A protein has these predicted regions:
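Acidic beta-strand-loop-alpha-helix segment within the catalytic core
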Residues: 107-207, 256-278
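N-terminal subdomain of lithium-sensitive/metallo-dependent phosphomonoesterases centered on the IMPase/IPPase/PAP
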Residues: 1-89, 184, 242, 248-250, ...
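Short, surface-exposed acidic/glycine-rich loop or hinge patches that mediate macromolecular interfaces
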Residues: 47, 69, 176-177, 204, ...
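Residue-level signal for inorganic ion chemistry
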Residues: 20, 46, 57, 92, ...
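Short glycine/proline-enriched turns and hinge-like loops at secondary-structure junctions
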Residues: 76-78, 96-100, 130, 257
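Glycine-rich active-site/cofactor-binding loop and its immediate structural neighborhood
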Residues: 80-119
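Oxyanion/phosphate-interacting regions
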Residues: 1-13, 17, 183-192, 199, ...
């Protein structure tokens, strides 16, 4: 893929992050919370971030599949060899709680595989970006690209994974969706590891923690959609990790007829499959 596309995605994520923070930091804002058809929350920040991302990415040759955009039927989408998959504000519940654990997720998917990913944490001003050719990186303290080239961004960033190997076996799990099946998995891991630590986090940050090497595994045995995982999946792949369907050797696939993900586990590629069992 052309390098310009990842710069497009970075610009879109940073600009959307600026929109989100302008609302998040406004003490008078009540976030104008609505309920979507699946009863999940929707705020004005979700809508504004979507509009910003769509405007920037419209200059690329690829169609856009966004959580907050119009979802075309599969009879149309299946023709898309390459597409953007976007969650303008991943972790709306965390945004509403004002705990800072929300992200902007932008992925480029080619033939059902996420080949490029950008995740931005507006509160922490942390940017994760990756593609198959350059690898995965984390850049801290960024709010705008300011005409920096991709090489300049990479030179200022940390190559992932940054932290490999620690005394404890670290599991990262959802702060808002810790299912009974996940709790069973955690107990099972205690049979294989003498010292297990559980980290709770929101949004796609969990995948990033595995990509960084700060966590060993992220089990997700609860519903997610393709836009929740595509960007993180691209970053994980570029960092030597994989997002496997739970209980299988197969990674998640994208632009499916049903946009709901199966349960999955994020872990290094070399890990034995027994850890993917439920």
């Amino acid at each position: 893929m052309e390098r310009q596309y990842i710069l497009n995605a970075i610009d879109a994520a940073l600009c959307a992050g600026k929109d989100i923070i302008s609302i998040y930091d406004d003490p008078a804002s009540d976030f104008e919370i609505e309920k979507k058809a699946d009863n999940s929350p929707l705020t004005i920040a979700d809508r504004k971030a979507h509009e910003t991302i769509a405007k920037i990415l419209q200059d690329t040759p690829f169609p856009l599949l966004s959580e907050e955009g119009k979802h075309l039927p599969f009879v149309e989408r299946h023709k898309w060899e390459t597409l953007w998959i976007v969650d303008p504000l991943d972790g709306t519940k965390e945004f509403i709680k004002r705990n800072g654990e929300f992200t902007v997720n932008i992925a480029l998917v080619h033939n059902s595989v996420p080949v490029m990913g950008v995740i931005y944490l507006p509160v922490k001003r942390e940017l994760y970006f990756a593609d198959e050719e350059i690898g995965a990186y984390k850049l801290s303290g960024i709010t705008t690209r300011a005409e920096a080239t991709l090489d300049e961004l990479m030179a200022s960033a940390v190559r992932l994974p940054d932290k490999v190997g620690h005394d404890k076996f670290v599991i990262v799990a959802s702060r808002s969706h810790l299912s009974p099946e996940t709790e069973v998995y955690i107990e099972e891991m205690k049979r294989y590891h003498s010292d297990v630590e559980l980290i709770s986090s929101g949004s796609s940050i969990k995948i990033c923690l595995v990509a960084e090497g700060k966590a060993d595994v992220y089990p997700r045995f609860a519903p997610t959609m393709e836009w929740d995982t595509a960007a993180g999946h691209a970053i994980a792949r570029a960092a030597g990790m994989e997002v496997y369907q739970a209980g299988k050797e197969e990674p998640l696939r994208y632009n499916k007829e049903d946009l709901l993900n199966p349960w999955f586990i994020v872990e290094p590629r070399h890990v034995k499959t027994k850890k993917r069992s439920l």
